[in-house]
Swiss-Prot record:
Post-translational modification (record): Acetylated. Deacetylation by the SIR2-homolog deacetylase activates the enzyme.
A GO CC annotation given for this chain: cytosol
Superkingdom of this protein's organism: Bacteria
Family the UniProt entry places it in: Belongs to the ATP-dependent AMP-binding enzyme family.
Amino acids binding CoA: R191, G192, G193, R194, T311, N335, S523, R584
Function, as annotated: Catalyzes the conversion of acetate into acetyl-CoA (AcCoA), an essential intermediate at the junction of anabolic and catabolic pathways. AcsA undergoes a two-step reaction. In the first half reaction, AcsA combines acetate with ATP to form acetyl-adenylate (AcAMP) intermediate. In the second half reaction, it can then transfer the acetyl group from AcAMP to the sulfhydryl group of CoA, forming the product AcCoA.
Organism encoding this protein: Shewanella sp. (strain ANA-3)
Cofactor: Mg(2+)
GO BP term (any one): acetyl-CoA biosynthetic process from acetate
Alphabetical list of Pfam families matching this protein: ACAS_N, AMP-binding, AMP-binding_C
Name the UniProt record assigns to this protein: Acetyl-coenzyme A synthetase
Binding locations of ATP: G387, E388, P389, D411, T412, W413, W414, Q415, T416, D500, R515, R526
Catalytic activity: acetate + ATP + CoA = acetyl-CoA + AMP + diphosphate
EC number(s) recorded for this UniProt protein: 6.2.1.1
Length: 650
């Protein structure tokens, strides 16, 4: 491995970090050889009402699947995020909030957050919410979203947070599946200068004929925008909490009692309700937050994810608050009203740790580094990446422009299903390579297998599986355990199949190559789309690229690239040929794109994930039945791509 592509841990960071390389190796070895002993000790990091004596009862046998952690202990997640900090840190700031408009700012201490959660938990009880009931939360990025989650956890209700950009149909499908009794929303949300009609979307969703379970809709007044009102069903948040008591006893929950549902897209298109339980999840979310981000008390931590995604659950609410952290929550998007916003917020709030997504980094790259001319960034210590593999070019830009070449980058790989980070560098322990998620976290046993399920040793490439359970793992698909077993444990017997492919290099570092269905087979050779995308984006005129396979008469599959150019760059046939040669030079002739379509934008979900199933269909000229596009941030992008597609059979 060339020295340019290896970023060594600095002596200063290693000396002050929670874990150095020798400690990582020792702790990791213990976590694999003696998981019972390791987790018996580390489970104590959270507070238990009845301490556990039983640690782990797990098997990945698809005929006898069992995932149980700390399973005779009892606890409460809300108490772990709030009550346990009150004696010593009641006045510490828990949440710093900045609105879409930077003039709107709030600070909430742990004591104040505790009071708000208790009052709202009592309000929920007054509306008939009881232990085990499912409550749907469809909220903007305001502190009350976290209040609602923690209030549910306090009284043993199961929250199901739906991302505030989802359509009424998407909301309805989740409400129906979970049979929610109560929905919590706001009149409107603000995002990028636009008002999002949250209450109207809820009203439309609840008109669906199969929605029969909802009794109450609690509405937060965020903007004061006009809303329709259903008497007897709708109730204002403020009117409920005005009269509610500030004292709310916690519900004692079993470690394996459900904490939340979070719906994620399945390959079939039907959302699946990922169920996470309380004990193992809280241990794992808090432990990964502390060790992966080398978190020190008093630091300001900013995760840019929306609360509607797992990253928002684990690394904006439960993990950081369990650790007594100060969390920055931003209502809007970090490149509005200008790309300078991210840097301005880091400086304004003296952010020490930043956790964001490659899609934002690439968007800022495309705008140009001049937007960071006035950015100081001296407060920043650790930076993270999450959501998809980060291409080396974006990694280096992030490191140089945002981190001023002194902040370690933790490129984290995990999933909604895993509850927390599984493969990641640790800042004081791991030399990093741009584009690699590097090594497994404690207790995590990744392996690569071929398509027959045979384990591959050494430097190789294959399907990424996990050989044993970890505490943060999902327990089932809500209401469909068979689907859980089928999706994750039937493909490779005795293993959890992640659905991702990966490469392991000569140093044992893992490189995520993309979903296994994002692998192109060109003339019998497997190519990860992420690899071709990385090569394209490393060209200075390319802002973003998405690569898919399409039917090819000779090769079986050809390579079809959608390319977004940097602002001000002219599209031309010459540039198209230049990019083909560029990829050929970067990877090899085999990886040369057959077709390159210019794209002003790519179809993305509101969390920034590129929806490649649309791109695959357009590339294959199958444009008559593309399926539901309601989850896209901008469905109009699809029409443009169809009109300018290259593979027409006309």
């Amino acid at each position: 491995m060339s020295s340019q592509s290896l970023y060594k841990v600095s002596g200063n960071i290693a000396a002050n970090a929670l874990v150095n390389n020798d400690q990582y190796k020792k702790m990791y070895q213990e976590s694999i050889v003696n998981p019972e002993g390791f987790w018996r000790e580390h489970g104590k990091r959270i507070d238990w009402i009845k301490p556990y004596t039983k640690i782990k009862k797990t098997t990945f046998d698809d005929h006898n699947l069992s995932i149980n952690w700390f399973y005779d202990g009892t606890l409460n997640a809300s108490a772990n995020c709030l009550d346990r900090h009150l004696a010593e840190h009641s006045d510490r700031v828990a949440i710093i909030w900045e609105g879409d408009n930077a003039s709107e700012q709030r600070q909430i201490t742990y004591g104040e957050l505790h009071t708000q959660v208790c009052k709202f938990a009592n309000a929920l009880r007054s509306q008939g919410v009881r232990r085990g009931d499912i409550v749907t939360i469809y909220m903007p990025m305001v502190p009350e979203a976290a209040v609602a989650m923690l209030a549910c956890a306090r009284i043993g209700a199961v929250h199901s947070v739906v991302f505030g950009g989802f359509s009424p149909d998407s909301i309805a499908s989740r409400v129906i599946d979970g049979k929610s009794k109560v929905v919590i929303t706001a009149d409107e949300g603000m995002r990028g200068g636009r008002a999002i009609p949250l209450k109207r979307n809820i009203d439309d969703a609840l008109k669906h004929p199969d929605v029969t379970s909802v009794e109450k809709v609690i509405v937060l007044k965020r903007t004061g925008g006009k809303v329709d009102w259903v008497e007897g069903r709708d109730v204002w948040w403020h009117s409920l909490v005005e009269t509610a008591s500030e004292h709310c006893a916690i519900e004692e929950m079993g470690a394996e009692d459900p904490l939340f549902l979070l719906y994620t897209s399945g390959s079939t298109g039907n959302p699946k309700g990922v169920l996470h339980t309380t004990g193992g999840y809280m241990v794992y979310a808090s432990m990964t937050h502390e060790y992966v981000f080398d978190y020190k008390p008093g630091e300001i931590y900013w995760c840019t994810a929306d609360v509607g995604w797992i990253t928002g659950h684990s690394y904006m609410v439960y993990g950081p608050l369990a650790n007594g952290a100060t969390v920055l929550i931003h209502e809007g998007i970090p490149n509005y009203p200008s790309p300078a916003r991210l840097g301005e917020m880091i400086d304004r709030h003296k952010v020490n740790i930043l956790y964001t997504a490659p899609t934002l980094i690439r968007a800022l790259m495309a705008e140009g580094k001049q937007h960071f001319d006035k950015y100081d960034g001296s407060s920043l210590r650790i930076m993270g990446s999450v959501g998809e593999p980060i291409n080396p070019e974006a990694w280096r830009w992030y490191h140089e422009v945002i981190g001023h070449e002194h902040c370690p980058i933790v490129d984290t790989w995990w999933q909604t299903e895993t509850g927390g980070i599984l493969i990641t560098p640790l800042p004081g322990a791991t030399d990093t390579k741009p584009g690699s998620a590097t090594r497994p976290f404690f207790g995590v046993q990744p392996a690569l297998v071929d398509n027959m399920g045979n384990i591959l040793e050494g430097a190789t490439e294959g399907n990424l599986v996990l050989l044993d359970s970890w505490p943060g793992q999902m327990r089932t698909v809500y209401g469909d355990h068979e689907r859980f077993v089928l999706t994750y444990f039937k493909t490779f017997r005795g293993m959890y199949f992640t659905g991702d492919g990966a490469r392991r290099d000569e140093d044992g570092y893992y490189w995520i190559t993309g979903r296994v269905d994002d692998v192109i087979n060109v003339s019998g050779h497997r190519l990860g789309t992420a690899e071709v995308e990385s090569a394209l984006v490393s060209h200075e005129l390319v802002a973003e690229a998405a690569v898919v396979g399409y039917p090819h008469d000779i090769k079986g599959q050809g390579i079809y690239a959608y390319v977004t150019l940097t602002r001000g760059t002219e599209e031309s046939e010459e540039l198209r040929q230049e990019l083909r040669q560029w990829v050929r030079k970067e990877i090899g002739a085999l990886a040369t794109p057959d077709l390159i379509q210019w794209a002003t934008g790519l179809p993305k979900t509101r969390s920034g994930k590129i929806m490649r199933r649309f791109l695959r269909k357009i590339a294959a000229n199958e444009v008559t039945n593309l399926g539901d596009a309601s989850t896209l941030a901008d469905p109009a992008v699809i029409e443009t791509l169809i009109e300018t597609r290259l593979n027409r059979n006309e």
